[in-house]
Swiss-Prot record:
Pfam family, one: PMSR
One Gene Ontology molecular-function label: peptide-methionine (S)-S-oxide reductase activity
Source organism (scientific name): Mycobacterium sp. (strain KMS)
Enzyme Commission number(s) of this protein: 1.8.4.11
GO biological process, one term: protein modification process
Keyword hit for Oxidoreductase: yes
Coiled coil: none
Biological classification of the source: Bacteria, Bacillati, Actinomycetota, Actinomycetes, Mycobacteriales
Protein name, as recorded: Peptide methionine sulfoxide reductase MsrA
This protein's UniProt keywords: Oxidoreductase
Length: 171
């Protein structure tokens, strides 16, 4: 039996999210897809209400959910509603789809730390909602930037971005 855990995050175009998150220590695998919408079996051309998302399988002996969330908040702008870079619409919203109550607690705590830190110019608008069905995207979207390294992305690591705990954050 595997001790691996799952996380489902949305923060703009799934290509850039996957490219950066898959390289993080403790991440075992990733796949991009759609979740949080109205229709079953969504596709790139038909995914009303769904967010472009990434399902992350990680080894909790090497990383934890909090570390994944801190990196997630570093690589996308969680203060813009339904937008990342040039991508606009609910497909590109910032969202955390939690799989259990502990993930929900950690997500809300991390958001409070991000808000208190002043690292972003506004308040976090990231949705925190229970995970529903995750629909894997078409094969051409999987590991897209690994195959097309000069392809489109709006995600960038911010190397000096370090999230302090609330007690250490600016008032």
């Amino acid at each position: 039996m595997s001790d691996h855990k799952k996380a489902i995050l949305a923060g703009g175009c799934f290509w850039g999210m996957q490219d950066l998150i898959r390289k993080q220590p403790g991440v075992v695998s990733t796949r991009v897809g759609y979740t949080g919408g109205q229709n079953d079996h969504p596709t790139y051309r038909n995914h009303p209400g769904h967010a472009e998302s990434i399902e992350i399988t990680y080894d909790p002996a090497q990383t934890d959910y909090r570390a994944l969330l801190e990196f997630f908040f570093q690589i996308h702008d969680p203060t813009t509603k339904n937008r990342q870079g040039n991508d606009v619409g609910t497909s590109y919203r910032s969202a955390i789809f939690y799989v259990d109550d502990e993930q929900k607690r950690v997500a809300l705590d991390t958001i409070a730390d991000v808000d208190a830190s002043g690292l972003w110019p506004g308040k976090v608008v990231t949705e925190v909602t229970p995970a529903g069905e995750f629909w894997e995207a078409e094969p051409e979207h999987q590991d897209y930037l690994e195959r097309m390294p000069w392809g489109y992305t709006c995600h960038f690591p911010r190397p000096d971005w370090k999230l302090p705990k609330r007690a250490d954050a600016k008032a």
